[in-house]
């Protein structure tokens, strides 16, 4: 799940001038050559269909990586459905800020939810589920696992009693930098294919 309260990206009339230090043609790459129609060029691209896919692709791929590792699936799900929309305000954003995605893996379903609005209108406070707002939860017959950060996993029984905790060996950002510096892909903790499958 990805429950991150995201404010409106604003609603501008017409188009905006691209900063003179930006080669906009290079920035766009293969995307359609359209005028800039949002306030922040360098971050709000996440919410435009030509360049991004909202929090599903911005934050969600990290949680889906972890969920797939639990499933043991090294492939794209054979079937997927999604429902959602851009709710709560009218702005220049296009991609969904509220969305549920169902991956129909053979092992077990992987369900991902995006909530880009606060838990109470205007509060900006993140909603939570089982103590997590950006997390992975694995439901099993005799209990469940919670991954609420990138450094640990807690295991609970069906009465929500914590029975075990595992600590990780470090963050993946540092590992990526280390692999770039060594120029050795074998230094990566995970193959690049992992990110591709989740995205």
Model-flagged regions — what are they?
Residues 2-54, 58-199:
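Contiguous beta-strand/loop segments that form the cofactor/metal-binding neighborhood of enzyme cores
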């Amino acid at each position: 799940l990805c429950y991150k309260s995201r404010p409106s990206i604003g609603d501008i009339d017409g188009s905006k001038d691209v900063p003179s230090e930006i080669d906009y043609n290079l920035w766009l790459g293969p995307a359609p050559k359209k005028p800039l129609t949002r306030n922040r060029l360098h971050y709000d691209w996440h919410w435009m269909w030509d360049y991004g896919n909202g929090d599903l692709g911005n934050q969600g791929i990290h949680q889906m990586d972890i969920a797939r590792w639990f499933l043991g699936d090294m492939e794209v799900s054979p079937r997927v459905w999604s429902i959602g929309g851009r709710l709560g305000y009218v702005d220049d954003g296009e991609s969904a800020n509220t969305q549920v995605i169902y991956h129909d893996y053979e092992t077990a379903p992987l369900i991902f939810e995006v909530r880009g609005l606060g838990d109470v209108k205007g509060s900006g406070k993140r909603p939570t589920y089982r103590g997590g707002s950006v997390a992975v939860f694995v439901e099993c017959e005799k209990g469940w696992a919670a991954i609420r950060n990138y450094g640990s996993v807690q295991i609970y029984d069906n009465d929500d009693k914590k029975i075990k905790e595992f600590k990780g060996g470090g963050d993946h950002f540092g590992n990526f930098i280390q692999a770039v510096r060594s120029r050795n892909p074998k230094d990566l903790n995970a193959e690049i294919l992992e990110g591709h499958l989740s995205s």
